């Protein structure tokens, strides 16, 4: 299924039903009083989060949504039926922005959570309500109000505990495949990963969610490559793993590659740049000898001071230990 993380849709809530003008007329009550019922309220439109949905693709092809109108009131004080509410099912982590103001107006972050997008129109009232001592046969009633209209943008930010960051072909997809059941495409060419992937990493009785996004290249902050569009999916991760290929097949410099990604991250968002990151040195199986020494030299060259991990995702070397360390870190954060 194609991954879609941003759509614009138009919403029209239901109109309230009109009130009714009616008078009681029965065989032995030829001049009964007013008995016009109220209309029904118009239906509203809600977002509803579903953990089993992972894309906004359904809203890419259908852009307009209408809730049901309320029914008009009837005689004998019968109220009109309220219009049914409409629920738009979206992935957990979906935010809503008003197109007119470009301001965020809401979000759904938990399974089953709802958020009202537009409110249905208020019902009209029947002539029964207008009876008084001076007006025993009122013909006054009110019309139902129009439902609210709004144009909104839905944005999906994936909810992951750990997010993977790095250049194309750094081995991020191989890593997420090696520690979870996720199956992103893996190949020896740039941008194998075209869309984000989520994988559940199980460590004993615990588990956490890992996200793989398309690789970041130089100029991503200005729109180059695929990384810019998907960098936003890192914002809600509890920590980020910067995956570096220690032995690139194109013979590029791992040090320069590391700083290229860090530079683009800082240009894109200072908030994202300040997020907690761990360094993962990948493809150590391609180093002929002195693996620990070469990794340590790399860490010193980039001036990295935090925790780092050396792995071979393809050979599953060090990946279980990495998963355990990440799980320990996440458990301490709760």
From Swiss-Prot:
Q: Which Pfam families match?
A: GTP1_OBG (PF01018), MMR_HSR1 (PF01926)
Sorted alphabetically, the keyword list is: Cytoplasm, GTP-binding, Hydrolase, Magnesium, Metal-binding, Nucleotide-binding
UniProt superkingdom: Bacteria
User: Is Hydrolase among this UniProt entry's keywords?
Assistant: yes
Uppermost EC category: hydrolase
Domain OBG-type G stretches: 160-331
Major location, coarse class?
A: cytoplasm
Which family does the UniProt entry place this protein in? Belongs to the TRAFAC class OBG-HflX-like GTPase superfamily. OBG GTPase family.
Record's protein name: GTPase Obg
The root-end lineage is: Bacteria, Pseudomonadati, Pseudomonadota, Gammaproteobacteria, Thiotrichales
